[in-house]
């Protein structure tokens, strides 16, 4: 439970504390060990020193708990008639990666393909104080596997949409929201309002819909010519956009993906103000002039991580002087040339 105890109805260990409020070990572990010994199921006991996860806020030990969540099934047929690239989200994504999208550099294809090929279902829900709500209702007494567990009603959806367009997502959290959206359609007392929020990557992954498709100045087919971001977005924006578009449009939301590396210091370390290894473009141009910075960019391979620092800039400045002196000599030698 939320207080660090087993549920009261759990046989043998109901109500026992795994962790106490002060973060100290409760009586649950010792009770489990004693029960295992009692039934002859304990192979060995002892103490070992090992790392253990702690909260970054409170610094107290944490407990991993299984909690009910909402998922998007990547291997379940979507049944929307958009089967040109496959019947499931995974099939559509993998086919789009191979047949529809151009990857720059080509290695980007392998990264996203391997991730989607091996990924589990997408966990859509989060339990947070604020965010984009899932905006759904579940029927009391039904189980998740039942057809009527999730309320599917176009009139209810229209009411929610209208409220959000005027009041924003806060409309979902107002007092009486359930009665407002359900009254006159179904009995509000028969349903539970879900207050889970969406994964933020679902939020960012929907940009193809409201930037490209649902605007007068969007693209004709709702697809982007190019998505451009850093290499970390194979796991992020490229990934979530692909899954969501394959679930709603039947194919990728983009025709091309260009991936760039990151700018690091000259030792290959991530820049950090606390470490003091940042390089300001303004400082570079003040010391060397803009052409040195332009030349560093021009001679760098953007498809991999870029390094910059005092010694590297000195080398670029030397190259620039050689180029300038050589070109000056060549231009001077052209006098009276015909």
Set out the residue ranges of the language-model regions.
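Alpha-helical recognition segments enriched in aromatics with Gly/Pro capping
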Residues: 1-4, 128-130, 151-305
């Amino acid at each position: 439970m939320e207080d660090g105890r087993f549920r009261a109805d759990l046989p043998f260990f109901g109500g026992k504390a795994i962790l106490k409020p002060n973060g100290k070990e409760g009586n649950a572990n010792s009770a489990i060990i004693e029960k295992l010994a009692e039934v002859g199921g304990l192979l060995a006991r002892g103490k070992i020193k090992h790392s253990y996860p702690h909260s970054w806020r409170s610094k107290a030990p944490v407990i991993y708990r299984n909690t009910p969540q909402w998922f998007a099934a990547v291997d379940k047929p979507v049944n929307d008639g958009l089967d040109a690239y496959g019947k499931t989200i995974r099939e559509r994504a993998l086919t789009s990666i191979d047949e529809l999208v151009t990857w720059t550099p080509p290695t980007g294809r392998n990264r996203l393909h391997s991730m989607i090929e091996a990924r589990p279902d997408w966990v859509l829900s989060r339990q947070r104080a604020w965010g984009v709500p899932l905006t759904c209702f579940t029927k009391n007494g039904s189980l998740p596997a039942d057809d009527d567990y999730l309320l599917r009603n176009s009139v209810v959806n229209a009411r929610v949409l209208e409220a959000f367009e005027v009041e924003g997502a806060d409309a979902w959290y107002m007092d009486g929201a359930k009665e407002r959206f359900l009254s006159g359609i179904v009995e509000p007392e028969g349903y539970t309002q879900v207050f889970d929020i969406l994964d933020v990557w679902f939020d960012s992954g929907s940009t193809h819909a409201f930037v490209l498709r649902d605007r007068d100045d969007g693209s004709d087919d709702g697809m982007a010519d190019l998505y451009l971001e850093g290499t970390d977005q194979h796991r992020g924006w490229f990934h979530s956009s692909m899954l969501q578009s394959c679930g709603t449009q039947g194919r990728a939301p983009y025709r091309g993906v260009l991936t760039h590396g990151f700018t690091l210091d000259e030792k290959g370390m991530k820049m950090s103000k606390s470490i003091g290894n940042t390089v300001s473009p303004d400082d570079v141009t003040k010391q060397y002039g803009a052409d040195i910075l332009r030349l560093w960019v021009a001679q760098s391979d953007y498809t991999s991580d870029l390094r910059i620092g005092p010694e590297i800039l000195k080398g670029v400045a030397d190259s620039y002087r050689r180029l300038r002196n050589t070109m000056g000599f060549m231009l001077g030698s052209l006098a009276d040339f015909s």
